[in-house]
Amino acid sequence: IVGGYECEAYSKPYQVSINLGY
């Protein structure tokens, strides 16, 4: 998972978290 692209499939809030790296 890089940049939160994969996480978009999980949940929107998590996408932001991974995108920021937190």
Swiss-Prot record:
pH dependence: Optimum pH is 9.0. Active from pH 5.0 to 11.0.
Principal cellular location given in the protein's record: cytoplasm
Family: Belongs to the peptidase S1 family.
Peptidase S1 domain span: 1-22
Tissue expression as described in the entry: Detected in skeletal muscle (at protein level).
Protein's cellular compartments: Cytoplasm
Function: Serine protease which degrades the myosin heavy chain and tropomyosin, but not actin. Selectively cleaves Arg-|-Xaa bonds.
A single Gene Ontology CC term: cytoplasm
Transmembrane segments: none
EC number(s) on file: 3.4.21.-
Gene Ontology biological process terms, A to Z: proteolysis
Name of the protein in question: Myofibril-bound serine protease
Keywords: Cytoplasm, Hydrolase, Protease, Serine protease
Temperature dependence: Optimum temperature is 35 degrees Celsius. Active from 20 to 70 degrees Celsius.
Gene Ontology MF terms: serine-type peptidase activity
